[in-house]
Amino acid sequence: MVYISNGQVLDSRSQSPWRLSLITDFFWGIAEFVVLFFKTLLQQDVKKRRSYGNSSDSRYDDGRGPPGNPPRRMGRINHLRGPSPPPMAGGUGR
């Protein structure tokens, strides 16, 4: 790719693909990715805590408190009664 530096037109093919600036830029890119990844994990935790109200208003600051709701069960819903399933294939009731 052609670019201008100090009033001169230069071609990037003349530079080595493994120059030091490329390696350092790659390192800092990975470092910033790791930092932002962990920041997003921590910020979601802070948002959850804020949704329950101010910590000064809470009676349960030390982690104790009433238990939460039990986890929802996944699978079939057995408490609703619907029509019974059709009989197995077979005769006509003779």
Curated annotation (Swiss-Prot):
Site: Cleavage. Where? 81-82
Localization in the cell: Endoplasmic reticulum membrane; Cell membrane
Q: A GO biological process this protein is involved in?
A: positive regulation of interleukin-6 production
What does the entry say induces or represses the expression of this protein? By ER stress (at protein level). Displays a slow increase with a lag phase of 6 hours but exhibits a dramatic increase after incubation with ER stress agents for more than 12 hours with maximum induction at 24 hours. Also induced by accumulation of misfolded proteins in the ER.
Gene Ontology annotations for the cellular component aspect, listed alphabetically: endoplasmic reticulum; endoplasmic reticulum membrane; Golgi apparatus; plasma membrane
Could you say which tissues express the protein in this record?
A: Highly expressed in heart.
Q: How is it modified after translation?
A: Cleaved by CAPN2/m-calpain in resting macrophages but not in activated macrophages. Macrophage activation up-regulates expression of the calpain inhibitor CAST/calpastatin, resulting in inhibition of CAPN2 activity.
State the residue spans of region: Disordered.
48-94
- InterPro entries linked: Se_SelK/SelG
Q: Its function? A: Required for Ca(2+) flux in immune cells and plays a role in T-cell proliferation and in T-cell and neutrophil migration. Involved in endoplasmic reticulum-associated degradation (ERAD) of soluble glycosylated proteins. Required for palmitoylation and cell surface expression of CD36 and involved in macrophage uptake of low-density lipoprotein and in foam cell formation. Together with ZDHHC6, required for palmitoylation of ITPR1 in immune cells, leading to regulate ITPR1 stability and function. Plays a role in protection of cells from ER stress-induced apoptosis.
Quaternary organization: Interacts with DERL1, DERL2, DERL3 and SELENOS. The SELENOK-SELENOS complex interacts with VCP. Interacts with ZDHHC6.
Which PANTHER family does the entry mention?
SELENOPROTEIN K (PTHR16875:SF0)
* Name of this protein: Selenoprotein K
State the organism named in the record: Homo sapiens
